[in-house]
From Swiss-Prot:
Species of provenance: Blochmanniella pennsylvanica (strain BPEN)
Family, as annotated: Belongs to the bacterial ribosomal protein bL35 family.
Protein name: Large ribosomal subunit protein bL35
GO biological process, one term: translation
GO cellular component: cytosolic large ribosomal subunit
Keyword annotations from UniProtKB, A to Z: Ribonucleoprotein, Ribosomal protein
Domain of life (superkingdom): Bacteria
One Pfam family hit: Ribosomal_L35p
GO terms of molecular function: structural constituent of ribosome
Amino acid sequence: MPKIKTLQAASKRFKITALGKYKYKHANMRHILTKKSTKHKRHLRQKSILPKIYLTTIMKYLPYI
């Protein structure tokens, strides 16, 4: 049986933590930032932990990570 391929787009977007959770960077921080408040931009700069509902999907995309 052949090996399962890793989805490269997912491997570039998600990193696994020491506890086995997946962290990712928020979207909406590239351009059109003048209408966003400073507080909103500050929260977007921080990394987030992936919710459990998406965990099975991401584990299919990243079988060896």
